[in-house]
Amino acid sequence: MDKIVIKGGNKLTGEVKVEGAKNAVLPILTASLLASDKPSKLVNVPALSDVETINNVLTTLNADVTYKKDENAVVVDATKTLNEEAPYEYVSKMRASILVMGPLLARLGHAIVALPGGCAIGSRPIEQHIKGFEALGAEIHLENGNIYANAKDGLKGTSIHLDFPSVGATQNIIMAASLAKGKTLIENAAKEPEIVDLANYINEMGGRITGAGTDTITINGVESLHGVEHAIIPDRIEAGTLLIAGAITRGDIFVRGAIKEHMASLVYKLEEMGVELDYQEDGIRVRAEGDLQPVDIKTLPHPGFPTDMQSQMMALLLTANGHKVVTETVFENRFMHVAEFKRMNANINVEGRSAKLEGKSQLQGAQVKATDLRAAAALILAGLVADGKTSVTELNHLDRGYVDLHGKLKQLGAEIERIND
């Protein structure tokens, strides 16, 4: 089993580059199934295990997928007749596999998709996806662990109001509606930058989508879509993690590819704490020194504070003075990393959906295990400043969302190694 071992205490300095966004590339790869004319080539694709998983799903659906890791590119040719079924073998590994349902319904009028797997954070229900497909005219039923969808009369544009701004449901409905007859309105839509990237990609393919990044998205269905070349946006969560790495070590680093507008809620909190940020055209420079000020954070759908940055921000807050409260409103069960932080001598108490952090914790190196993708990064961040050695296991979580994080931190001056036991 792999582990990452960190000896804390080094300030990070230098420059580091952000990869393409995991949460953008997965839906965009599935959207490539919509192109019945010409293959699509995606560039700035991160070399992640989740990308390999979704590529395997696309292959089972009869798409030809060529993964050019050395170029950070994937070519998807979905011009042949697609298979209707995404089997449990692959879908069970990752929740994003549910995103093939929208494109399959759009292209074939029917689909069978196994109920998904992925991170064990909360229930992450798929009711909003199903509600959207039914509104577009599909009949849905669940049987033997599979979702069966059939639109025998084709998908027809409609108005859909989401109960909450679900990112996955917004993406799935956009993809299904892009080839539906007529106009579809999605109200209370998710507004994440990854939604905008998906809409831009489909528009480049010949789609007619407006309003992405706002509460209301309009999709005018078209007859067909064609393959194009598209560059994936930088990963705002990786960028945020690296900014915090600079701040937590009281270092000075330049994060190339970090985009302020994609992470405004995070950078404003960092500035509130006394972290110095210099916004440049091609990235953000982060500098910090001395004591940081206490702030409270509350996770919310975009443009609020991202739940995917909650555990990393908690690591930074452990190094700040005063009383801090972290409130999680997006997912239940997203404080599983607290028990691991406590093994490192963190002073945290969880009360319901809030975690209370008292004073500056004198973090100590310990053996800890990652409980999910972002917790893995947060424990590594804590290890950068802990006294002594920290060993982080369960790195399969980390590999789902970060490319060579330990290598990037080492390049910036961290004393860190990945060891295969």
From Swiss-Prot:
Record InterPro entries: Enolpyruvate_Tfrase_dom (IPR001986), Enolpyruvate_Tfrase_sf (IPR036968), MurA_subfamily (IPR050068), RNA3'P_cycl/enolpyr_Trfase_a/b (IPR013792), UDP_GlcNAc_COvinyl_MurA (IPR005750)
Top-level lineage group: Bacteria
Pathway membership: Cell wall biogenesis; peptidoglycan biosynthesis
Residue positions of the active site: C119
GO molecular function, one term: UDP-N-acetylglucosamine 1-carboxyvinyltransferase activity
Enzyme Commission number(s) from the entry: 2.5.1.7
GO biological process, one term: regulation of cell shape
Transmembrane stretches, start-end: none
Catalytic activity of the protein: phosphoenolpyruvate + UDP-N-acetyl-alpha-D-glucosamine = UDP-N-acetyl-3-O-(1-carboxyvinyl)-alpha-D-glucosamine + phosphate
Subcellular location: Cytoplasm
Entry's Gene Ontology cellular component terms: cytoplasm
Keywords: Cell cycle, Cell division, Cell shape, Cell wall biogenesis/degradation, Cytoplasm, Peptidoglycan synthesis, Pyruvate, Transferase
Pfam families for this protein: EPSP_synthase
General function of this protein: Cell wall formation. Adds enolpyruvyl to UDP-N-acetylglucosamine.
Family listed: Belongs to the EPSP synthase family. MurA subfamily.
Name used for this protein in its record: UDP-N-acetylglucosamine 1-carboxyvinyltransferase 1
Species this chain originates from: Staphylococcus aureus (strain bovine RF122 / ET3-1)
